């Protein structure tokens, strides 16, 4: 534990700016009650009943009111951080909040009260076993949620839904490890612990449950991160019109002049709660215009980073030689949807096709101008993302969670291989189970480095 993890800390816990209510939060750390009671007396001029709202004046150093509001005192361990906590709820003007914050710092100087760092209150909650690491991350995810579905999923993670799944997996792995260790420790016994307890069957069940958890986590990661979708193609094929159609607003300038879009135009839209980060880019062509060439270079950079590329074509011409050249440069591994736009000029009905000669490629015929086929394109993007309609019960997950789950999955797969060669590989079987358990524990913080904690909590807002 870092030395600063026990310092008394204070911060404004509400967003910057003006509001009806502002909150200053103090967590007393090692100071405990000996620090809390004198500060309460100095600020409020009276004792506070624990866990009761008291309407009091907030006093300056001379005993004059700075403000009046609600004071709440939570003795340890029954508080957000698990420490003695004081919350002062006053009027939410920035000057009033700064005066109240400075008054706390001045009154608490004797016991080392300092400004909190970003995420430090939630870090204290984690260190004091009020939250595990997945729940602590869910606090930030709930604050940052950009869709209702993401907010609900973050709430489920904060309530411990994700953590309970991980703890159940860890318990099952530990039980299986005990069987393996027993067989290793008593090789001369007639009892075959692995056979008697159906160790292989237990491992198969753990792997199936892990696959289910990983599937839900992928859905949650989609809700949190969304999908980066790049519109690419030659000039004047309707990329900007498609962006406007997907967004339902006139975001990009649309003209019949080739090269109108010279830099990217980005917009995030929601489809079934999934954030789709749509990026309109400069038309891809050979040009002598230096500004346009810079825009085209940026287009290729965006394509390299994309989750999905929408390759737009003019449905009147179909796939031209120039389009073939563009398609050949698309990075391997990035899904591409071929979008044939302007069907309003050809009379071709909006549809989704899977050309037999094109492998996994999908073609969507649509009219961005009229809106025909836009819903089909949205559905195709969700399909590529792997979103399952009605997956409301998922919990929000982060990339580090997915990495740990995949690593645990690989260790369990290796354990299954060793189980088939029991006589030669029992030690390796046990080791793979241990490594899988370690990966799962890292998700909830049972086994986590201080460096990782620093990165996670530094991304929180101050006062949380």
UniProtKB/Swiss-Prot annotation:
Lineage top rank: taxon: Bacteria
Annotated (6S)-5-formyl-5,6,7,8-tetrahydrofolate binding sites: 25, 87, 130, 464
Binding site for K(+): 236, 255, 257, 260
Residue numbers binding GTP: 236-241, 255-261, 280-283
PANTHER family per UniProt: TRNA MODIFICATION GTPASE GTPBP3, TRNA MODIFICATION GTPASE GTPBP3, MITOCHONDRIAL
Subunit structure: Homodimer. Heterotetramer of two MnmE and two MnmG subunits.
Name of the protein in question: tRNA modification GTPase MnmE
Organism taxonomic ancestry: Bacteria, Pseudomonadati, Pseudomonadota, Betaproteobacteria, Burkholderiales
Gene symbol of the encoding locus: mnmE
